[in-house]
Amino acid sequence: CGICRTDLDVVEGRVKAPTYPVIPGHQIIGRVARIGGKSSDFRDGDRVGVAWINSADGVCRWCRAGMENLCPQFRSTGCDVDGGYAEYAVVPAAFAYSIPDGLTDAEAAPLLCAGAIGWRSLRLTRLTDGERLGLIGFGASAHLVLQLARHRYPSSPIHVFARSPAERAFARDLGATWTGEIGDAPPDQLDAIIDTTPAWKPIVDALPHLAAGGRLVINAIRKSSVDKNELLRLDYASHLWMEREIKSVANVTREDVKQTLAAAIEIGLHPTVEILPLRDANRALARLSNAKGLRGAMVLDIAES
């Protein structure tokens, strides 16, 4: 099961579970152990994935439009229902995904959320090939977005803003055109920016570097309240005028997950992962909170625990 910052949000209470205790984890890879009577999509032993979206009502206007991520009855894995930091999990068959043979379990896990929400964020930028893209932060999601963007928009320069020299070097290794510290000025105005950090300051710092008509997409379920006073620095003329847009990402759809898995196979995308035993889950979440010593995504190996 992949480890995600949203797991930390659930554990620390920024995302409220309806009941506690709850088992976190929503980037699950496993084998089908038992099938309900009405299921015909899978067989016992099939390798499947389970993502953040655990179910939706299927009848509201959002579900009918293929946007079940906005369903008022949206239920999330590892929050509304128990998740993947466990030996077994239960999921509706319609919200499970066949995992392609070209990916290991550990590689496939982060694609289910870090990859899928990154894919959705990239689509929401409405970037066209040749336009300049910025990525703020360079963790599990951003390192996948960079690779997806290079494939989808091969002529687009990609600028990465990251805190540590190691993260910036990692971004350059994966093909970033330019790297700088968070808050640095890029060499050119950016047509789109995807923010993957938990804080507000990087967004406020980045907005003046957004070109006229540019889009900034916030790739996060929640933002920290620690630095929310940074929003008081917003100046309409320098941060928002000239039809700049700020857009949030709300969850993912099933189609986002399917497209991400298909794209990974098409371009040979193999997430950089660190595999840890379940007993290290708390230490892994602490590392995620501090954002120190991370390269790519962390994945818990439940079977070896």
Predicted features by range, described:
Residues 6-9:
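Cytochrome P450 core scaffold surrounding the K-helix E-X-X-R motif
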Residues 1, 12-61, 100-102:
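Glycine-rich beta-strand-centered segment in the early N-terminal region that forms part
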Residues 48, 101-183:
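Mid-domain Rossmann-like dinucleotide-binding core that forms the NAD(H)/NADP(H) cofactor-binding site
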Residues 41-44, 129, 212:
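Short, flexible surface segments
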Residues 125, 152, 165-245:
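Glycine-rich cofactor phosphate-binding loops and adjacent beta1-alpha1 units
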Residues 162, 254-305:
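C-terminal hydrophobic helical "lid"/dimerization subdomain
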Residues 29, 49, 97, 134, ...:
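Structural detector of well-ordered beta-strand residues that form the stable sheet scaffold
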Residues 56-136:
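NAD(P)H dinucleotide-binding glycine-rich loop of Rossmann-like/cofactor-binding domains
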